[in-house]
Structure formats: C-alpha cells, structure tokens
Amino acid sequence: MEGIRQYWKRTDKFYLLLCIFSSTMAVVALASWATKQGNGFAVDELTGAITGIGDYRRAVVQGGAAVLGLCVALLLSCIDYRSLVKVWPVHVAVTWGLVLPPLFIRNVRIGPLTIGYNAGDTDNYSWYKLAGFTFQPTELAKISFILTFAMHLNNVRSRINEPKELAKLLLHLLAPIAIIHVQGDDGTAIIYGIIGCCMMFAAGLSWKYIIGAIAAAGAAVAAAFAFFSDKIGKGYQWYRILAVIDPENTTGWAPNEATWKNIIYQQQRGEIAIGSGGIFGNGLFSGRYYSVPNAHNDFFLSWIGNVAGFVGCCVVLGVLLALVIKTFATGARSEDLLGSYICAGIGGALMAQIAVNVGMNLRVLPVIGVTLPFYSAGGSSVLMLYICVGLVLSVYMHNTKSLFG
C-alpha cells in the first residue's frame, strides 16, 4: 500500500487522468456507434435471441486494450527510460523483424496467422491477423524508432548541424519511411517524418536547414502538380489529393462519375455528419445519425460531431491538445536531453495524428488512413499509445528538474 502511495505521489497524475478520460469517452462513443447501427448485439434471425456482442465488440476490445495498456504504462513508468534505450538492439530486431516480412509476403496464412494482411480496400498489406485480431507492427516500430532516434540525436547533439552528421540522421529517418511507403502505408510514413522533424527541431537543428527543407518540399510539390500530374499515377491516393483541391471535379481529374463519387463519398458524408450535430449533437444513444464509412475508425471525429456536436468535438480535441502540451512540457523539464528528445517524438506523433485526422474529417486534407489517438477503434493502436504514455511518465518520474527552475 505504501508503494502505491509513493507511486501516486511521484507520477504525473494529471497526465494519467487525461489518458483515462480519453479512453473512457472512446468506449462510450464506440458503444453509441454500435447501438446506432441497429444491430449492436448479434441476434439469431429465427429466434431473436442474442447470440453475441456483435458491433459492441469494438467497444469491448477498446476498453480491454485501454485497461491492459494502462497496466503496461504504469509498469513501464517505473523503469528508467535510459535503460530501455540501452537495449535498442533487442527492440529494433523484434519490431523491424515484424515489419519486414509483409514487404515480401502478402495474405499468406500459417495456421490462424495471416502475414501481409490487407485490413482495408487499399494497397496496404502491412498488417498481421491472428484469430480475428489485427495488428500493424509499424505502430510498435514507431516506438523503437523514437528511442533509437533520440539516442542518435543525444550522441551527436553538439554536431547536429554538421553536414556529415545531418546526413546520417536523415538516413536514419528516411530508411523506415521508405520501407513503410513501399508497404503502401503513406499515412504512417508521413507521421514518421513529422516525428523525426520534431525531434531534430528539439535537438537544435539550424533554421537554415528547416527553411531550406520547407522550401524544397514546397517546390517539389508544385513541380509535381505542374509538370508530372499526368505521370504520377491515377491510383486512389492521387485521386484523394485531387478531391481535396477540386471536390467538384471541374478539372476532370476523375476518369468517370462513378470514380469521382466513390472518392469523395467518405469525406462528404463525414462533413454532413459533423454539420448535422449542431452545437450539442443528436444524442449518444438516441436521435438520428448519418452513416459514414469507417465512422468507428479514421472518421470517428465525424461520429463524435454527429452525436455530441461542436461542444463534444471541442471537449475531445481539448483533452487531446492538453495531452500534447503535457508531453512537450515533460520533455522540457527533463534533466537530460535524451528524455527531452523522447518526449518530443511522442508529442510530435500525437500532434501529427490529431492534426491529420481532423484535417481528413473536415476535408482540408486527403484521406490517408491516420487514426484519432485513443478514440479510433483498434486494440493494438491503443496498446501502443499507452506504451508511449509509459515512456512519458518514465521521463517525468526519473527527472526532478522544475519546468521553470
């Protein structure tokens, strides 16, 4: 009992409560979504008897993953994050040993396990499926990347602006991005890029490199649209980008009306769902709702807007913003730069996922399969999030410097 009291005294209680609040609200909202489907429970068509939890399964999995994740986070917070960085060969071998097979193996079943599983209607085969549960190893590899990149930055912190060292850092960053891109998961690849940029910025990367990189990226995008738009490709990813720029297809980017309607349908329905909720929403378990494809996943914010309105969205995003700020603040108060870089990476990941997901739901960014942290359905992603929470708490608990002292 004394140990629990001492832990509670040392840990970041507010950070933990923000995470628990987010997970609780996610489970309630997913239960609401299941209810509104009209078949939350699985029912026998002949007898009408309830035979299973049906769509409520997502809420149950989300809640179970949150409880398990919280336990892992509490355990992880008791371990000094420096010791986790030191065993980098172990977690690099494990995580990337899981990431690489789907590059060469697609939809291959070995007993109950499927390697290279496609969890949607895209070209992304980076998943594993085991006994009905899916897992994306790039989420676990993201944590390993943050730890190893933080170690790399810590080792070269006084030489980060030397071209030779910067080139090595960029190779460290671009290698996993390239692998994930080849797997067809550009959304996750973009998140990795933002994580790396946040960590290098925290390490003191010169503004001349930052401004130069932004200018080069802008020029590359402009050139792609101006000179190579007809050669880049006509796949769904390119169409999704063009759908944001020209949603009415006035330039004729879609080859036919069916393709145009299919590409814009999800975001169009998401906009309608958010708008229909008004200020206070249509009610969590009562009232009308608008069907949105993947409303339980990438477009969960549109569901929250539908049932809880503008106020509900503000509460959800406000709590997530507080989590991001607290993560960066923990890094700022770290006694060593290693802890600062880890928190910068985790804070950057949260910030990027929130910003991209909100942009997708509001139709200001293309749909690239980025979920809303804590809220979008997915047990493995919730578990990975809580591992990140554990790392942030570890930095908090194993440092004593005041943020302003």
Q: Language model features by range: what are they?
A:
Residues 68, 92, 316-323:
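Transmembrane alpha-helices of multi-pass, membrane-embedded glycan-processing enzymes
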Residues 164-169, 213, 244, 290, ...:
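Alpha-helical transmembrane segments of multi-pass membrane proteins, especially transporters
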